[in-house]
Amino acid sequence: MKTMSKSSLRLHFLSLLLLCCVSPSSFVIIRFITHNHFDGLVRCHPHKFQALTQFKNEFDTRRCNHSNYFNGIWCDNSKVRSQSYDYGTVSVELSNQTVASSSFIIFATLISLTTTSPPLPSLPSLFPTLRNLTKLTVLDLSHNHFSGTLKPNNSLFELHHLRYLNLEVNNFSSSLPSEFGYLNNLQHCGLKEFPNIFKTLKKMEAIDVSNNRINGKIPEWLWSLPLLHLVNILNNSFDGFEGSTEVLVNSSVRILLLESNNFEGALPSLPHSINAFSAGHNNFTGEIPLSICTRTSLGVLDLNYNNLIGPVSQCLSNVTFVNLRKNNLEGTIPETFIVGSSIRTLDVGYNRLTGKLPRSLLNCSSLEFLSVDNNRIKDTFPFWLKALPKLQVLTLSSNKFYGPISPPHQGPLGFPELRILEISDNKFTGSLSSRYFENWKASSAMMNEYVGLYMVYEKNPYGVVVYTFLDRIDLKYKGLNMEQARVLTSYSAIDFSRNLLEGNIPESIGLLKALIALNLSNNAFTGHIPQSLANLKELQSLDMSRNQLSGTIPNGLKQLSFLAYISVSHNQLKGEIPQGTQITGQLKSSFEGNVGLCGLPLEERCFDNSASPTQHHKQDEEEEEEQVLHWKAVAMGYGPGLLVGFAIAYVIASYKPEWLTKIIGPNKRRN
């Protein structure tokens, strides 16, 4: 075989999926092992075996972990079969190894080639060899350091079966030549520009140029590609569309992701087939177009962080994910949620909404996330929402809510799936019953990993791309106001701060094992800090400042290994601050305003003499134990003595009653 130049690829791992020509049972597994021989070869055709062996020998395996299959070459029939590859074809994925480009000459049936991060050096010798891969359909060269220009005579443009091409995150210096149009079977391409040559790619289904610095306007011709169903341009600097706002209407696009750009002006009219539209973090203005109500397949509408005005749309009942957060919307939340509504997320926080919560929300049996924080809603606590069986997040903070938050019967609150309840900065009053947190079954379970509230799947022949739309809330956490994402099943949090609540803090708070943040500050709570807080092993943030709490700080809090923030300042607490790393490492301000508190991190010492508080505590315990032992000794002597005394008296009374008369006297005996 003719030897070509030896410019190398440095690869993370190499996996070779080989389908031998005999039958599905003839798939092979080849692994690098200590003695450098093969294991598991099965009925492979001789020329296939020779090609595979030669390809394996191109690699430097001296630094491989030979016990790890992914540091070698392997073949997996299940993966080949699941990809529906035709017999006689091969798929290769390369990373962090060294291979001469001549290797690819032997694989005329290669259909998939991937060389991804960590970055590879410039590889001018790779492209000439590509013309030998006549059946190649997938080529992923993303996240490398390829440089230079793509010349018109590049063998890349001879891959007429190519359907998937990814060249993103490289250092190519040229624009795409017109020869790019020869790839007329291309369906998916990730680049850093919108080349005009794309006009000729009539089979293009998905374009993803996200996370780049592309500016300007989206070309009008893009929407005329007949099979295009996904456009992802998030995290760029686009500022508008060529043509009118009606340019998208007749497009076949189903998923349109415009988030985090510089778009201005009115929202575009959406395609009739749209499933998901995300345009958050832009500068869109005007009202939400009425045409949205005619897009019956719309499942995701994400318009957060814009400057939209006007009312909330009347037709959102069957949109699964609705995020209108941080706009300038006015009016009331419409009473138009119908029975059987499919809405799962409704976030209208940080607007100018007034009125009351719509009672038609009771029709939304799938509702999991409801956020109306930072508006001007004036209403009582929505106990009626307990009828929603899946409600997990409820945020009412910074509105004009008022009245009690305990049910009239003073029992448990009654939201079994609730994990996050934020009602801070309102005018809620009254006390919490001792059983208030008993029915929070979801928060009483241990933490689970969040898998995304609403996901859109974009399927293609090369895998499944998942776009996840996360819920976000503003939570005062560890003393800071922070925007939290991944909120649903990943943790539990309670924020009752800045209200007019009073009475004792219920011991039932200790049942919420998934609780990571508890904020009861700026109320009028009295009584002791619940000892049951020591049961909250996941707790990371605890704020009970500016109340009227008394007594001591529970010693069990020092055992909470995740507790990163605690504040009990400005109460009426006394005694020694528990001495544990998580507590003594806090700022002094977390404990100030309690005249009776002493010990680190405060400067006030708890004792005047040289003995430490711990030593005094031990001495007190020893004295108590000594007294208990003395009483035990007395009891041990008293019990048997009393028994013997009764026995002697019984014998005397039975057999010698005159002796008993002499001992106690006749008068005493008559009594």
From Swiss-Prot:
Cytoplasmic side stretches: 654-671
This protein's record includes keyword RNA-binding: no
Principal place of residence: membrane
LRR repeats: 107-129, 133-159, 160-182, 184-200, 201-225, 228-250, 251-276, 277-294, 295-316, 317-340, 341-364, 366-387, 388-412, 415-439, 489-512, 513-536, 537-560, 562-585
Glycosylation sites noted in the Swiss-Prot or TrEMBL record: N65, N96, N132, N153, N171, N235, N250, N283, N318, N363, N519
GO cellular component: plasma membrane
Locations listed in the record: Cell membrane
Annotated transmembrane regions: 633-653
Range of residues in the leader sequence: 1-27
Intervals, Extracellular compartment: 28-632
Keyword 4Fe-4S applies: no
InterPro entries assigned: Leu-rich_rpt, LRR_dom_sf
Keywords: Cell membrane, Glycoprotein, Leucine-rich repeat, Membrane, Receptor, Repeat, Signal, Transmembrane, Transmembrane helix
Membrane topology type: Single-pass type I membrane protein
Family: Belongs to the RLP family.
Descriptive protein name: Receptor-like protein 20
